[in-house]
Amino acid sequence: MINADDELLPETSEILKNECKKIDADIYYGNCYWVDSERNLEYVSKPKHDLSKLLYNMVLIHPSTFVKKKAYEECGLFDVTYKYCMDKELLYRMYKAGKKFDYIDRCLTKFKAGGVSDTHSKAVFKEGSRMALSYGESQIKVKSIEIIKTVRNQMVNMIKETRVYRVLKGI
């Protein structure tokens, strides 16, 4: 599920080939290097492993997620009515269908920060809410989670504007 400005690490193909020989899964996922616009390393991102939370959170790192063709054939392709959450929706659909996920504790890709999902958080929240409702979640629960995420996002943005944050980021 790699995007145009993301990149596979040179050893990723070999790692995946070996993992496929060891473990028969439908979806393989791993860690990722997050890089800035100049391709400088910002941090290593590891997925959260509670796949049941996929309905509300992207717990996997989509550029470091690899899906076998058979899983697409059995579960379908991306739902293009989603602009921001199509990868999360597809992975949730595969999870609900009982597809087997396998975690590889290695960095498999470089992910460029600052993409569309990062810069359109309100639209992402709205689309995520639509997705949750389409899977039968209650309106009250969906709206509550949307409010919590919005407040959390606003707090993070406020922290990023402080002098202390800028000093610590420069270290």
What are these regions (language model features)?
Residues 44-127, 131:
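Conserved nucleotide-sugar donor-binding catalytic segment
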Residues 7, 11-18, 89-93, 127-130, ...:
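Alpha-helical elements of Rossmann-like donor-binding domains used by nucleotide-donor carbohydrate transfer enzymes
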